[in-house]
Structures are given as structure tokens and as C-alpha cells.
Amino acid sequence: MRTKHILMIFIVLLSVLSCVSPEESQPAEPGNIIVLMYHRIVNGKATNLYERSSEDFENDLKFLKANSINVITFNDLERIFTSGQMPEGNSAILTFDDGDHSWYSIVKPLLLEYKMKATFFLWVYMIGHESFIDWNEVEQMSHYVADDGEKPFLFASHSYSHSYLLDSKPGFPSEEEYNSFLDYEFGVSKNLIESHTNTEVNIFALPYGDGAGDPEIIAAAKRNGYKFIRTSKWGAITDPQINLFEIPSLPILDNTTTDLIGSYLNL
């Protein structure tokens, strides 16, 4: 009788354990977050440092998918900061600088195919010039709604004139004039992008990465309504209490390998 009773308990335990999936029994560990910085995507072979071939770019997206790297946004990053907890698994934020026309012709279709979202930092003065995206294309992308009801393409500021923000300071005769220059670069670019996208612009990417962590530049960003500054400092986000005005990134260049991306995520 005792043996029969033990056998029944064993069968019940087995049935309970069989209902627990591997994911439930082994929750994912908190991972890292990497901000990937692209510029121009080209068909065929890349011919300079800041170009990436469409084939390599697509392989990057496949790498993210294959390694279950969640593509998130800067708003998600703010929620992580507020919660004080890193998300389970690794994450990536896709960003693009300047405004090359390849964003519309190459990047947009690939992101839609792989169901990924991205932030595009505009060099506002150059929009509509040769080889750059135009405002009509910016509007089309920013207003696009995916099948899940989300808008996957967000436009943000890379300044108005793409000037060095900190290194330009000695050229101004007074602090007041320098701050007026900063307000123009932050404010005018923000207002123009918002007028074409009907979306709040609160993310800024530093031209040339110049001025990362500088108090005056951060103050100018804040008074012009920004909540984030993406820098060009190489690194991954490993702590939820990140300085949102000094966000590191990883430039993706013509010869960057997916192994390098993986190394920042401990893969």
C-alpha cells in the first residue's frame, strides 16, 4: 500500500513538472543594451568608413533576430531607467545619423521585413539636398503605422548645421552668444522636425560626438525640451541608472563584424 501511495505522488509530480516550460523554469538573466549607430547603407560594396553594405546591414538584422536581441526605443530606455531594473535578455536600439536617402530606399524596406524599429537623427539643414532624404519622405516614414499599430520610424535631431557644439565655443565672443548658438542648433532643428512629423522631438545625437557630457551642452538640451543625448562614446548600457544625457553607442562601420556587436552583449 505504501509503495502504491509513493508511486501516485511520483506520477503527480511528473505531471506538474511537465506543465512547466523551460522558459518558466529558467527565467532569462538581465542583459545589456547596445545602441547601434549607422550612417549610409549602400547597395554593393561600401566605399568609405561610414558606409555599410545592404548585405551586411541585413546580416546585422538577422544576427539580432537569431540571438533573440530585443529591439527597443529610447522611450523604453527611459522606462528602464525609471524602473531601476535591466530587462531580461539583451536589447538593442537602432539609430541612423545625418539623413542619407538610403534610409528611405534601403533601410525602410529591410526594417519592415524584419519587423524592427529605429530612430533617425536628421542633419536638418541638408534635408532635401542631393543624396539626402527629403521632407516628404520623412513625413511618409514618420506617419507609417505597422500591422501592430506602432509607428516604427522615429525622427530626432542631429542639430541644424552639424557643427561642432563644444569645439566651436572659442569662436564666440561671449557666453550669451555661444548659448544662442546652442539654442539655435537644438531648438530650430527640433521645431522643424516636429512641424513635419507631428511627433515630439526629445532625442539628440551629437554631431561628431563633440561635447559629450559637457554641462553647458546638456543644459542647452534640457532647456530646449530634450530628454536624451546619444553620444559617440563606445560602450554598452549595463546599468539601468544610466545618464540619459550621455548615452553610449557602437558605430557600425564598413568593416564592423557581428562578433563585435556580440562582444558588447557578452555573446
Each language-model region and where it sits:
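Bacterial N-terminal signal peptides
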Residues: 8-16
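Positively charged n-region of N-terminal signal peptides that target proteins for export
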Residues: 1-5
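A cross-kingdom marker for long, charged
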Residues: 233-264
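Metal-dependent polysaccharide deacetylase catalytic core of the NodB/CE4 family, i.e.
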Residues: 31-44, 48, 90-92, 100-102, ...
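Short, electropositive alpha-helical surface patch
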Residues: 209-227
